[in-house]
């Protein structure tokens, strides 16, 4: 799973199901693909979204700011700063400062995420606030690791009351990851289609998959509903590859 796919998965796992979730997923995809580079417009759009909690808005604002190329002197947004202040709890801030110092020594995403997961969501949010206000003091990978760790803590707390898990991965995150990977596979099919004779068939399968993922996000579905979604799509992709006489192992 690529870094941006992982970030998209974790961030979407804390967004409530509904039409807005599908819209946010599309914005994230566009931002990560470099198709949306107007940070000011993005932040203004995010600030006025209903339903989302201040913390979720803060996390999304942090991700947008981290990803979209912007002027060095760009003004920080108050709604992001307020959301990432650890609820004003001095204990959260103390822990955030300690974590921030540790993160400055980390260079890999997974190393930083492992360190971050030992802290509470409040301390992690405060740490994000420190990084947001001094953007550039840690690497982008490390900053994304803090985002994913925070979302994992939030998703865990949301799910803990009825969680009976064999693995440590949260079902909400697994569910979101299946949908993100299905979208990615659909994109791969569209790119492969080109102008071949079977292009219409490939485009149709990919289009149906994308519509299904959008619908699942918009109406809200239980975590088990996405099981097999990516696998079904990959089977279609592999059958298409076979007919075309090509092998695209990297999409597996």
UniProtKB/Swiss-Prot annotation:
Gene3D superfamilies: 1.10.10.180, 1.20.91.10. Keywords: Host nucleus, Membrane, RNA-binding, Viral matrix protein, Virion. Its main location: virion. GO terms for biological process: viral budding from plasma membrane. SUPFAM superfamilies: Influenza virus matrix protein M1. InterPro entries: Flu_matrix_M1, Flu_matrix_M1_C, Flu_matrix_M1_N, Flu_matrix_M1_N_sub1, Flu_matrix_M1_N_sub2, INFV_M1. GO terms for molecular function: RNA binding; structural constituent of virion. It is found in: Virion membrane; Host nucleus. SMART domains: Flu_M1_C. Residues 165-252 are annotated as: RNP-binding. GO terms for cellular component: host cell nucleus; membrane; virion membrane. It holds the Pfam family Flu_M1. A motif (Nuclear localization signal) lies at residues 101-105. It is a peripheral membrane protein. Residues 1-164 are annotated as: Membrane-binding. Homodimer and homomultimer. Interacts with NEP. Binds ribonucleocapsid by both interacting with genomic RNA and NP protein. May interact with HA and NA. Cannot bind NP without genomic RNA. Plays critical roles in virus replication, from virus entry and uncoating to assembly and budding of the virus particle. M1 binding to ribonucleocapsids (RNPs) in nucleus seems to inhibit viral transcription. Interaction of viral NEP with M1-RNP is thought to promote nuclear export of the complex, which is targeted to the virion assembly site at the apical plasma membrane in polarized epithelial cells. Interactions with NA and HA may bring M1, a non-raft-associated protein, into lipid rafts. Forms a continuous shell on the inner side of the lipid bilayer in virion, where it binds the RNP. Determines the virion's shape: spherical or filamentous. Clinical isolates of influenza are characterized by the presence of significant proportion of filamentous virions, whereas after multiple passage on eggs or cell culture, virions have only spherical morphology. Filamentous virions are thought to be important to infect neighboring cells, and spherical virions more suited to spread through aerosol between hosts organisms. Belongs to the influenza viruses Matrix protein M1 family. Most abundant protein in virion. When expressed alone can form virus-like particles in transfected cells. This is Matrix protein 1. It comes from Influenza A virus (strain A/Korea/426/1968 H2N2).
């Amino acid at each position: 799973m690529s870094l941006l796919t992982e970030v998209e998965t974790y961030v979407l796992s804390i967004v409530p199901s509904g039409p807005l979730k599908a819209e946010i997923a599309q914005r994230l995809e566009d931002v990560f693909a470099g198709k949306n580079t107007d940070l000011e417009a993005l932040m203004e759009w995010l600030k006025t979204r209903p339903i989302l909690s201040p913390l979720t808005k803060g996390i999304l604002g942090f991700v947008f700011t981290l990803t979209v190329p912007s002027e060095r002197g760009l003004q920080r947004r108050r709604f992001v700063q307020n959301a990432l202040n650890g609820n004003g709890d001095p204990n959260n801030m103390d822990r955030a400062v300690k974590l921030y110092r540790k993160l400055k020594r980390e260079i890999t995403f997974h190393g930083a995420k492992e360190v971050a997961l030992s802290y509470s969501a409040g301390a992690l949010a405060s740490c994000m606030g420190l990084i947001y206000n001094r953007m550039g003091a840690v690497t982008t990978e490390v900053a994304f690791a803090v985002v994913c760790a925070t979302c994992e803590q939030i998703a865990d707390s949301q799910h803990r009351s009825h969680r009976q898990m064999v693995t440590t991965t949260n079902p909400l995150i697994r569910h979101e990851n299946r949908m993100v990977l299905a979208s990615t596979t659909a994109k791969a099919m569209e790119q492969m289609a080109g102008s071949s004779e079977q292009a219409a068939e490939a485009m149709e399968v990919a289009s149906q998959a994308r519509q299904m993922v959008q619908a699942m996000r918009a109406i809200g579905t239980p975590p088990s509903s996405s099981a097999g979604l990516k696998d079904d799509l990959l089977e279609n992709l592999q059958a298409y590859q076979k007919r075309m006489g090509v092998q695209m192992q990297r999409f597996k």
